[in-house]
Design a protein with these regions (language model features):
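Conserved glycine-rich cofactor-binding loop
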Residues: 11-12
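C-terminal helical subdomain
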Residues: 170, 189-224, 231-233
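Residue(s) in the substrate-gating loop at a strand-loop-helix junction
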Residues: 130
Length: 243
């Protein structure tokens, strides 16, 4: 029986890369984006327009997947996200609420809709967090709060649904070369400066993050749940020798 995987935020760099990898592994992909036109070249069996920042939009994504592919998705990859780089005293309330809505609300509502659709069946989910939820990075207060909420959600839900056979994990990427970071990384000085922050050097690719997400969804991670895997070139855990 073919595995069905629902990928939200599938029009972004990491979502696209994950769709390619899971498609190559013979999964049937339901790709979700607010703008379905951006999914035209994404590897998917069905492309769904839905705003997962609302309960109704999240439920729509799961229902449309089930109706198109004949069953609820047993795999969920939530790649929706945004960022905000600003000190807290210069962060407007509207901007803060938008960051929480896009990053945390969408994760809560998507997980809620997916669990309900499975009706007690087992499955695996992976969410996108960030290194800024794990280590203090200046001027990232809003996104750190939102992604910290995602990590707490993952741990609590993993405990709640373990008995059902659901595995729920997350990845916490560092700076990744995607369309969302293209504006910063197109400047050589910014790219070189970012690369120097990581013990392994360089700026990681969307494909590298997607590989970690695909592994967490697969049988190789069958004994992992409630975990947040840092995909960050050692940024949050390693301090190399000073040369």
């Amino acid at each position: 029986m073919t595995t069905i995987a629902l990928i939200t935020g599938a029009s972004g760099g990491i979502g696209r890369a994950l769709a390619r990898q899971l498609h190559a592994a013979d999964c049937r992909i339901a790709a979700v984006s607010r703008d379905v036109g951006r999914l035209a070249d994404v590897d998917a069996a069905v492309r769904i327009a839905a705003d997962t920042t609302t309960p109704e939009g999240a439920a729509l994504a799961v229902t449309a997947c089930r109706e198109a592919l004949g069953a609820a998705p047993t795999l969920l990859a939530h790649c929706v996200g945004s960022t905000l780089i600003a000190p807290l005293h210069r962060t407007r309330a509207e901007a803060y609420r938008d960051v929480v809505r896009v990053n945390l609300d969408s994760a809560v509502f998507m997980l809620q809709a997916w669990v309900a659709a499975l009706q007690g069946a087992p499955g695996a989910a992976v969410f996108a967090s960030s290194v800024v939820a794990r280590i203090g990075v200046a001027n990232h207060e809003a996104i750190a709060a939102a992604k910290g909420g995602v990590e707490a959600l993952v741990r609590s839900a993993a405990a709640t649904y373990a008995g059902q056979g659901l595995r729920i994990n997350a990845v916490a990427p560092g700076m990744t070369d995607t369309p969302m970071t293209a504006g910063m990384l197109k400047m050589p000085a910014m790219r070189e400066g970012a690369a120097r922050q990581y013990p392994l050097g360089g700026v990681q690719t969307a494909e590298q993050v997607a590989e970690a997400m695909a592994w967490l969804l697969g049988d190789g991670a069958a004994r992992l749940t409630g975990q947040v895997l840092a995909v960050d070139g050692g940024f949050t855990t390693v301090r190399p020798l000073v040369k």
